[in-house]
Design a protein with these regions (language model features):
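Transmembrane alpha-helical segments of polytopic membrane transport and secretion proteins
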Residues: 1-28, 251-266
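Transmembrane-helix boundary motif in ABC transporter permease subunits
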Residues: 82-112
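C-terminal transmembrane helix and the adjacent membrane-cytosol boundary/short C-terminal tail
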Residues: 102, 159, 236-266
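Short cytoplasmic-facing helical segments at TM-TM junctions of multi-pass membrane proteins
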Residues: 110, 153-198, 223
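Generic hydrophobic transmembrane alpha-helix motif, especially the helices
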Residues: 113-149, 156-157
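Glycine-rich helix-loop "coupling/hinge" segments at transmembrane-helix boundaries
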Residues: 128-130, 205-242, 263-266
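Transmembrane alpha-helices
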Residues: 140-144, 177-210, 237, 242
Length: 266
């Protein structure tokens, strides 16, 4: 068998495996929904507390008709994306500064570890007091969950750069900025992309925490409001939508990562 036919066979096998994996995921999800619906209808579980897929569909339809749901989704999505963009820019700039000034990195590293380990849910009430109950506070809450971990992750990626490549640029007369632009940043793109995939979920978590405490709109607000007035279908529906948003945003960044890796290998 020549190399070309072996490669085609391998690619067919790879595509088949991906299809099987996707089918298995869909089957598991569909089975879970069917079991949940059956358990609610047969009174194995209390449908008032645990709801059911059919109840969630009816609640979704009702909230769509009064146009309240899309507004809440849009607010949470906008806050999450703004938090993510700010975290991306600030963490990348901070990681660059740490790489350019190693002494500063040595001094600041323990402080970043401490700040990253703080319980963010405990910070949210303070943010409300300091900044007020507004969208800015929710965005800062979203940033607080992801920022310091992102800085440390990106800086660790910069430090993994091949030292021989850095020395080569320096031997050719390049300074630190040349090493950064020509070696460190290009070689760290996989770290950047993987960090971004984590950050988008963390920002969503932080935004929801902020909405729990100081918001009048958003999916986090719907969860708190629904639990207070015992509209548990609204609570569970909001959680399901949050899961869908997280999966969609993660999937989009995953597609960007795959596209970059495919182009870099090609």
């Amino acid at each position: 068998m020549n190399e070309s036919s072996a490669q085609k066979r391998y690619l067919r096998k790879l595509r088949s495996r991906r299809r099987q994996t996707a089918l298995l995921r869909i089957s598991v999800f569909a089975g879970f929904l069917l079991l949940w619906e059956a358990a609610a209808r047969l009174d194995w579980i209390d449908s008032f507390i645990f709801s059911s897929p059919s109840d969630l569909v009816r609640t979704f339809h009702t909230m769509l008709l009064d146009q309240s749901l899309l507004s809440h989704i849009g607010i949470t999505l906008a806050e999450t994306l703004l938090s993510f963009l700010l975290v991306t820019g600030i963490s990348a700039a901070a990681a660059v500064l740490l790489w350019l000034f190693p002494r500063f990195a040595e001094v600041s590293e323990p402080y970043m570890v401490i700040l990253n380990s703080l319980p963010k849910s405990a910070l949210a009430p303070l943010l409300i007091v300091w900044l007020g109950a507004n969208m800015r506070t929710i965005i800062v809450a979203g940033m607080s969950v992801a920022l310091f971990g992102s800085i440390m992750s990106l800086y660790a990626g910069f430090r993994e750069t091949d030292p021989d490549m850095v020395k080569l640029v320096q031997t050719l007369g390049g300074g630190k900025s040349a090493c950064l632009l020509k070696v460190v940043l290009p070689s760290s793109v996989p770290y950047l992309l993987s960090t971004f995939k984590v950050n988008i979920g963390l920002c969503l978590v932080g935004v929801v925490i902020g909405e729990f405490i100081g918001a009048r709109k958003g999916l986090g607000y719907l969860i708190i409001y629904g639990s207070q007035v015992f509209k548990l279908n609204m609570v569970i529906l909001s959680i399901v939508i949050l899961c869908a948003i997280a999966a969609a945003l993660y999937g989009l960044l995953g597609l960007l990562e795959k596209r970059y890796l495919r182009e870099s290998e090609g």
